[in-house]
Each structure stands twice: as C-alpha cells, then as structure tokens.
C-alpha cells in the first residue's frame, strides 16, 4: 500500500531552508502518528512530496491511515496509489486496461499522466497512446478532454508506474511544531474548541488550561473536547492539560465585586492565572474563543480592559467570526456534539453587566480582591499529559470495571462517532452490539433497558472511561468498559 502526500502550497512557497525544515517536521509528524497504528509504515521525504508505504494491506489499516493523514496539519492532499513496473507504453496501456477497463463502459473519459525521469516519449505521447487504446478496446462513449465522467490519473516515475486510485483532501495549514507553543483557555464550549483547532492547524502546539467552576462533571466534558482535538489533529506532539480550581476566586468575586463589574473582573482574574501558567510552561501566547459582541464581556472596550492585565500576547482567532460559522466548524472537527452536552457553568452572572468597562472602576473593585489567591490556585492546579487522561480517569473511578470477556445480560455499547464506527465496524460473534455515540449518552442512556449491563467501547478506551465516569456520577451502576 502506498500514499503520495502533497505539501500545503504555503509550504512550497517558502525559501529553500524553511521549506526543508517544514517538510522534515511534517515527515516526523506523519511517522509519529502512523507508526502507533502500523509499525510497518515507512515515511520517505522527497523534494515536493512525502511517500508513505506499508506492507499491511488490510482494509481496516487502510481506512485508519487515510483517516490519520486527512487530519494531519500541513498536508494539501494525498493520493492513494497502486505501484507497478512497466516495460514500454504498450505495457502501460495493458496494465491500465486491466485496472479500469470495466469501469469505462458507457462513460466518457480522459487520461492524465505525470512523467518524471528520462523516457523516449512525452507525457502527451503517453496520454494519447493509453487513451487511444482504451477508446478502441472498451465500450466507452469516447474521450472527452474537458469535463469527462472519468479521469484516469497515472504517474510514470522512471521505470515505475503508479495508478492513482483516489485523491483525498488534506487538512492544509502548517505542520505541528513549526510555530511556537500556545496555551488555550478552554471551557468546553464551541468557541474555545474551534479557536484551539485553528492554532493547531496553523502549526502551534496547543496546551489546554481549564478554569473549573462547575465540578467534576464539567471537567470531564472539557477533557473530552481537549482530548478530541489532540487525538484527531495534534497527537504527533505531547501537550499538557491543566485544571485550575477557580471556585475560591469566584467566591471572592461574588463577595467583594459589584454585580455589573463581575464579568470583566472574572476574565481579568483568568488572564492573570493563565499568564502565570503560560510562563511556567514556556509558551508564547494565550488563546481564547472570544468573538466581538457575542456576549457582554466581548466588546472592544471590555476586551481592551481585560488584556491590560497581562503582558503576554493574547490571540483571538474567532474575533470576527459569526456564531453559526463557529458551530459549523465545531461539527466538522468533532467537538460540537461534546460541547452541546456541557452545561454552561458560570459562577458569576451579572444582572446588568457592563459593556463599557472603565479601567479606573475595575481597578477600584480589584483593590478589594486578595490577589494572592490567584497564585494559590495556580499552584494547586494539577497538570497532566493529555495522553494520560485515561490513567487519570482510572485513578478517579476504580469502581469502573474494564472487561475483555462477556457474560449473560451484557451488551456492548459502541460509543464511537458514526463515521468512525462505519470506517472500522465492531463485529463480535455471539455478542449483541448497539451503537450510541458518546455525545448522546448523557441524554439517551436512560432510555435504554436498565435491566441490562452495558460495556462501553471506543478505539483507545479513553472516551469510554470518561463516559463511564460520567454515567457513574449520574447514578447508573450498570456500566463497564470493554477493552478487547
């Protein structure tokens, strides 16, 4: 099995040294991601492309590699190819006839050939020879150079012949690690997830900082969003997840700050804490999901007042983005369904929030605040490697049992997304398997027959453990985790 990976055009426009550096980083990222699924994968860097090879030809492995390549930043598109050798142009024609002849019946077609190396024929010569032969020896409706129903793409590279079976779109952007690291203030909502994704796509390693205002269930949901982003788009690099216990700060604000100023003061306290954490991590900037005018605290005046509390660069990738566009993007990247299940936890709700904060008034309110509390909660914040989320969950809920065998009255509940389940179906002989995506569990699990025991399944066992914890905390004891 072979894939030809094409680099994002902005990479190709860079100077030679920069292009070389970006290409090598992308090669390493692809290798890191793919070899965890297939140890036989070889990743070879050429001047304008990256070759991915593997001896594992299984349909499941192919689907996994396609999914991973399509989610790796820095790739414009990649080609799924079949490789062979040839002797002459007639051999190229005969191999092409064997590959695509039956599919041309009743269809118009054209042949496109890219040629690399020294040959006694040109690319146009090859296209005419192969196309003419197919036109004469199949039941096609004829050659159509513009707008054909079928385009046959071949590549002749010296003595090798490549049939391009399918072209897959890539994610675009820059390879992860080509830009400086950043810290995302993630809440679990639509906005912070999408803003984090945009920086990942642009080549930054994104660490996650969560201000816990809503207890354990809220944190679990936010971990799901962060893990989804890392697992799908950024798993070539290690990142941190930090949960800052912000309840004491909220309590202090509720007690000492005027109602109308609470929202801006809370955001300033978050920026203070995030700046401290970012400095400890050695990152270059903070990211938020704020969009201009979306809520009362997100006016230009308020954002300016909020930013003055930190000397660190604060990035807002969504500042001029409509809410519906943000939600649509969240659905594409797979975080929307999780965000929809996360309640809005806000310990500070102003009845009449200010939309034009005055620095003098805000500073007057903050004089009442014990700012040492910020450093205290930052010092208390647990920092974990996002890959260890599964282990952290295991420590939190030892009562959630993981099983690999089945007993009577047990049903395997596949909680993967529909696309993932279709790409790699779970089929266990003699066992009842039902599908309920993880983002529907909170609302629909209670509608299932509760006299059954449900074994939650996902590919890596992380989301299933997180969901098992959520269901246990919600009072459901009839859940386990299935790990084959």
Curated annotation (Swiss-Prot):
Residues annotated for ATP binding in this entry: 185-186, 267, 289, 298
InterPro entries, sorted: Rhodanese-like_dom (IPR001763), Rhodanese-like_dom_sf (IPR036873), Rossmann-like_a/b/a_fold (IPR014729), ThiI_AANH (IPR020536), ThiI_fer (IPR054173), ThiI_N (IPR049961), THII_Thiazole_biosynth_dom (IPR026340), THUMP_dom (IPR004114)
Pathway: Cofactor biosynthesis; thiamine diphosphate biosynthesis
Gene3D superfamilies: 3.30.2130.30, HUPs, Rhodanese-like domain
Protein localization: Cytoplasm
Stored SUPFAM superfamilies: Adenine nucleotide alpha hydrolases-like (SSF52402), Rhodanese/Cell cycle control phosphatase (SSF52821), THUMP domain-like (SSF143437)
Domain called THUMP: residue spans: 63-167
Principal subcellular localization: cytoplasm
Known EC number: 2.8.1.4
Catalytic activity reported: [ThiI sulfur-carrier protein]-S-sulfanyl-L-cysteine + a uridine in tRNA + 2 reduced [2Fe-2S]-[ferredoxin] + ATP + H(+) = [ThiI sulfur-carrier protein]-L-cysteine + a 4-thiouridine in tRNA + 2 oxidized [2Fe-2S]-[ferredoxin] + AMP + diphosphate; [ThiS sulfur-carrier protein]-C-terminal Gly-Gly-AMP + S-sulfanyl-L-cysteinyl-[cysteine desulfurase] + AH2 = [ThiS sulfur-carrier protein]-C-terminal-Gly-aminoethanethioate + L-cysteinyl-[cysteine desulfurase] + A + AMP + 2 H(+)
Cysteines joined through disulfide linkages: 346-458
Active-site residues, Swiss-Prot/TrEMBL: 458
GO cellular component, one term: cytosol
GO molecular function: ATP binding; CCA tRNA nucleotidyltransferase activity; tRNA binding; tRNA-uracil-4 sulfurtransferase activity
Any single GO BP term: thiazole biosynthetic process
SMART domains documented for this protein: THUMP (SM00981)
Record bears the keyword Disulfide bond: yes
Rhodanese domain mapped to chain residues: 406-484
This protein's UniProt keywords: ATP-binding, Cytoplasm, Disulfide bond, Nucleotide-binding, Redox-active center, RNA-binding, Thiamine biosynthesis, Transferase, tRNA-binding
Superkingdom of the source species: Bacteria
NCBIfam families membership: ThiI_C_thiazole, tRNA uracil 4-sulfurtransferase ThiI
Family to which the UniProt record says this protein belongs: Belongs to the ThiI family.
UniProt function note: Catalyzes the ATP-dependent transfer of a sulfur to tRNA to produce 4-thiouridine in position 8 of tRNAs, which functions as a near-UV photosensor. Also catalyzes the transfer of sulfur to the sulfur carrier protein ThiS, forming ThiS-thiocarboxylate. This is a step in the synthesis of thiazole, in the thiamine biosynthesis pathway. The sulfur is donated as persulfide by IscS.
Protein name according to UniProt: tRNA sulfurtransferase
Protein source organism: Psychromonas ingrahamii (strain DSM 17664 / CCUG 51855 / 37)
Gene: thiI
